[in-house]
């Protein structure tokens, strides 16, 4: 029976109501965090002489036993509502209410669960960052391998300009790099302590909030008690990051599906990430990319659901907030699975260099450089050059001839001239690529420089990540030893 019902409400509660309101199904995500929170709070109560050292030590020792036992071995009676009451009930069974009942002094489940969520989520954010770093490293290997592999870039999914496949991969690395930065920034706002805010107005007991902050490895405290128990913006921010990353990853999945089709035929997805048809024996379907693309789209829905739950809630704690948690954890685990799938597919793709080169050499992908050459060599305005080359392309299509066959005629009509060498260079797709060696360009030496720059950033990320993981591990070691 839930000990909270002995007073005001009485012991009777309908079974369907208990099952409807319990959060035990998803409280497994905060079980260890709740133990840490309990130990830190009890330690502080001892130090502040709010409870006796004797009682406090008994509580802490029993909490460590519960941690070793694991949540799955506890009495998960739905009438207990949540993991907080399950743990407190276990303590009372072993120590009696006169001892165990002192642990919750000066604390509410409101600040307790807010603390637990932050403790658990900070670990998951670090895990996500770790997976992203691994994926980024693998993408850089692919980019380096193909820094001279000629291909064509697209706008509107229409062939646009020559690039290298290494440069194309770096475009995704660049986006992932921003995602990593966003998660690191969010970590700082997750890692602040609401513990000590109590129900919503702190407490008359002489608590030391800075001490529990220190014990739990938080960077700071949320000072305002009402904000402390109600704030879930750190969850929304994390889920927004997850949604943005999911959108970036979905673009990769889309390219894997499209570029591996027979019509494009520029890459081949490894067999282990594909399936065949139940009726068409020739088929090699990009199922993993498709399923990943679909799963990533659900992340947007989870974010909107959480925002909708939170919209217009009265200030401080409302039980509605409980329903945020399953959407958060589903987003986290879906994202981690999808990162690993995308990483695996990118790391194992086969690149059809000949097909990529063939695509770059047709459909007028060098037209922009031809216009640029007219500007540089003939001194005309770019808009005029744009019109001349546009006319060349139009005539080439209509008359079914190569640009080389009619360019001299068109230039002469416009009182312009170019040497054959300049024309050949302008129309050569790889020469186009080599010319584009400005920062962020596709020239092989610039791609190589960019890869080196990203590797330097990764080294910094890894150091930062290792430092934060060590901080979290130290908290666990100190409190659970």
Curated annotation (Swiss-Prot):
Which molecular function terms from Gene Ontology are attached? argininosuccinate lyase activity
Q: Which Pfam families match?
A: ASL_C2, Lyase_1
Q: If you read the UniProt record, what top EC class would you report for this enzyme, in one word?
A: lyase
- Which Gene3D superfamilies does the record match to this protein? Fumarase/aspartase (C-terminal domain), Fumarase/aspartase (Central domain), Fumarase/aspartase (N-terminal domain)
Q: Which UniProt keywords apply?
A: Amino-acid biosynthesis, Arginine biosynthesis, Cytoplasm, Lyase
| HAMAP family recorded | Arg_succ_lyase
Catalyzed reaction equations: 2-(N(omega)-L-arginino)succinate = fumarate + L-arginine
> Can the keyword Amino-acid biosynthesis be found in this entry's annotation?
yes
Q: Where is this chain primarily localised?
A: cytoplasm
Q: Which domain of life is it from?
A: Archaea
In Gene Ontology terms, what is a biological process of this protein? arginine biosynthetic process via ornithine
**UniProt cross-references to InterPro entries, sorted A to Z:** Arg_succ_lyase_C (IPR029419), Argininosuccinate_lyase (IPR009049), Fumarase/histidase_N (IPR024083), Fumarate_lyase_fam (IPR000362), Fumarate_lyase_N (IPR022761), L-Aspartase-like (IPR008948)
The record's subcellular locations are: Cytoplasm
Listed name of the protein: Argininosuccinate lyase
For this record, the Gene Ontology CC terms, alphabetical, are: cytosol
């Amino acid at each position: 029976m839930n000990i909270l019902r002995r007073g005001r409400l009485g012991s009777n509660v309908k079974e369907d109501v208990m099952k409807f309101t319990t959060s035990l199904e998803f409280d497994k995500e905060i079980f260890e965090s709740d133990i840490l929170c309990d130990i830190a709070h009890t330690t502080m109560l001892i130090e502040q002489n709010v409870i006796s050292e004797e009682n406090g030590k008994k509580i802490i020792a029993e909490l460590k036993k519960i941690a070793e036992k694991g949540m799955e071995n506890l009495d998960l009676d739905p009438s207990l509502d949540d993991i907080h009451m399950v743990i407190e009930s276990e303590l009372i069974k072993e120590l009696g209410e006169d001892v165990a009942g002192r642990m919750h002094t000066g604390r509410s489940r409101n600040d307790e669960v807010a603390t637990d969520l932050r403790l658990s989520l900070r670990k998951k954010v670090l895990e996500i960052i770790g997976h992203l770093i691994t994926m980024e490293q693998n993408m850089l290997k692919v980019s380096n391998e193909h820094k001279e592999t000629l291909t064509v870039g697209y706008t509107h999914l229409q062939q646009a300009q020559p690039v290298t496949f290494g440069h194309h991969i770096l475009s995704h690395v660049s986006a992932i790099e921003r995602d990593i930065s966003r998660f690191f920034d969010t970590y700082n706002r997750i890692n602040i302590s609401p513990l000590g805010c109590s129900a919503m107005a702190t407490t008359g007991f002489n608590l030391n909030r800075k001490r529990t902050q220190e014990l739990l490895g938080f960077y700071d405290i949320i000072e305002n008690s009402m904000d402390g128990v109600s704030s879930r913006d750190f969850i929304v921010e994390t889920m927004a990051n997850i949604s943005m990353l999911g959108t970036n990853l979905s673009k990769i999945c889309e390219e894997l599906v499209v570029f591996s089709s027979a019509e494009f035929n520029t890459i081949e997805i490894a067999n282990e990430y594909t399936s065949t048809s139940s009726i068409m024996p020739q088929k090699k379907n990009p199922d993993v990319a498709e399923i990943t693309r679909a799963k990533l789209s659900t992340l947007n829905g989870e974010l909107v659901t959480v925002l909708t739950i939170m919209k217009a809630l009265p200030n401080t704690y409302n039980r509605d907030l409980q329903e945020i948690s399953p959407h958060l954890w589903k987003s986290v685990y879906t994202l981690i699975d999808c990162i690993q799938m995308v990483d695996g597919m990118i790391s194992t793709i086969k690149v059809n260099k000949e097909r990529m080169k063939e695509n770059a050499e047709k459909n007028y992908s060098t037209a922009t450089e031809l216009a640029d050459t007219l500007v540089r060599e003939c001194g005309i305005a770019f808009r005029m050059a744009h019109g001349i080359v546009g006319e060349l392309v139009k005539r080439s299509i209509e008359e079914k001839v190569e640009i080389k066959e009619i360019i001299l005629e068109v230039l002469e009509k416009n009182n312009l001239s170019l040497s054959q060498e300049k024309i050949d260079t302008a129309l050569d797709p790889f020469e186009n690529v080599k010319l584009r060696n400005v920062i962020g360009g596709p020239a092989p030496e610039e791609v190589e420089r960019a890869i080196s720059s990203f590797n330097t950033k990764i080294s910094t990320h890894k150091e930062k990540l290792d430092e934060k993981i060590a901080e979290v591990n130290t908290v666990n070691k100190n409190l659970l030893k």
